[in-house]
Regions:
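Charged, often glycine-rich, active-site loop that binds/positions anionic groups
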Residues: 41-47, 271
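An acidic, glycine-/histidine-flanked metal-binding catalytic module
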Residues: 2-11, 19, 126-291
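Intrinsically disordered, low-complexity polar/charged tails and linkers
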Residues: 1-43, 54-57, 63
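Short secondary-structure boundary micro-motifs
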Residues: 2, 45-48, 86
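Long beta-strand-rich cores associated with HINT superfamily self-processing modules
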Residues: 63-183
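Generic secondary-structure boundary/loop-capping signal
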Residues: 36, 51-54, 134-135, 139
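Short, flexible, solvent-exposed loop/turn segments with mixed acidic/basic and small polar residues
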Residues: 47-55, 121-123
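Short, exposed beta-strand "edge-strand" segments with a Pro/Gly-rich flavor and a Y/T-containing core
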Residues: 26-34, 62-64, 89, 196, ...
Length: 291
């Protein structure tokens, strides 16, 4: 039974990983299936009345390298067959981590296999859903420590509010580090623009895994002669570009040239730049944006 659930978890994880890899995001992804002992414990402690069913029999965690990638993924995974979203509002007066958990339905073609694979004694207590948790790489380690050493043993922390607050303060420090890291790359991108290093500008602005080493000579020369186009790309909202790459399903060859041509299509619409698109690139962009 467990192996069949593992197979479903691997398939779901693979589909998510393929989508994120296609758009060049830097990430790690993990999945787990609740063991029968974990399931029994959770039902006894948290769902004793059985009015609320377990929704995270399968859990998937996406770990991003940058905090603003979470905004794109939250937007992307908030549409579709979503059952529940748990996205904490940030409170400037309180030290605590921000939860971003999204519960979605198991795809229809997997539901029967999912139900059959469940432990027979608990089938009525489990919904055909899975949970996606989104964290940054900095906060991932903190969450693992907090989950095992505080969340699972709350009685240890009774009367230790100052220590609990201090532990929350660690996540605040990590979040500050995340924002500082993002700011460093933003400043780097502006520095690159001012020195006409447009490949580095794109790399530091968008922070993606590109499939080429640099801009082509002809496009780089065109940007040097038309610096307003490079500046427009620098000022483009990264979230819009990432969401575009996520939501369109056709293949996209993520080179520096192709990204710049895509930005032009969705933001600038410079016809001279469109005229520079190689025939193969034009077909790819047309197919991608219509997918």
């Amino acid at each position: 039974m467990q192996s069949n659930l593992d197979k479903i978890a691997i398939q779901l994880t693979s589909e998510i990983s393929e989508s994120l890899s296609r758009c060049g995001l830097m990430f790690r992804i993990f999945s787990r299936v609740k063991t029968e002992s974990s399931l029994k414990h959770k039902l006894e402690v948290k769902y004793a009345d059985k009015k609320v069913k377990i929704q995270d029999m399968i859990g998937i965690r996406i770990v991003t390298y940058f905090h603003d990638d979470i905004d794109a993924l939250a937007l992307y995974y908030s549409v579709g067959d979503v059952v529940k979203k748990s996205i904490d509002e940030l409170d400037s007066s309180t030290f605590r981590p921000q939860r971003l958990n999204i519960t979605s339905r198991i795809p229809a073609d997997m539901v029967e296999e999912f139900k059959t694979a469940l432990p027979e004694n608990y089938r009525d207590c489990i919904e055909p859903t899975y949970e996606v948790q989104i964290r940054t790489v900095f906060s991932e380690g903190w969450h693992e420590v907090e989950h095992d050493l505080r969340y699972k043993c709350k009685e240890d922390w009774e009367g230790c509010e100052s220590y609990s607050r201090a532990l929350n303060g660690v996540i605040a420090t990590l979040e500050t580090a995340e924002w500082n890291m993002k700011a460093i790359f933003a400043e780097m991108a502006r520095h690159n623009f001012s020195h006409s290093d447009y490949t580095a500008m794109l790399r530091n602005k968008f922070r993606l895994k590109f499939k080429s080493e640099k801009l082509s000579g002809c496009l780089d020369d065109h940007l040097r002669a038309n610096t307003h186009l490079a500046e427009a790309a620098l000022n483009t909202d990264r979230l819009i570009v990432i969401c575009t790459l996520l939501t369109h399903k056709a293949d996209f060859n993520l080179t520096y040239d192709n990204l710049f041509f895509l930005i032009n299509r969705i933001e600038m619409m410079d016809f001279d730049l469109m005229a520079m698109e190689p025939a193969e690139t034009k077909i790819m962009l047309d197919t991608f944006l219509n997918s």
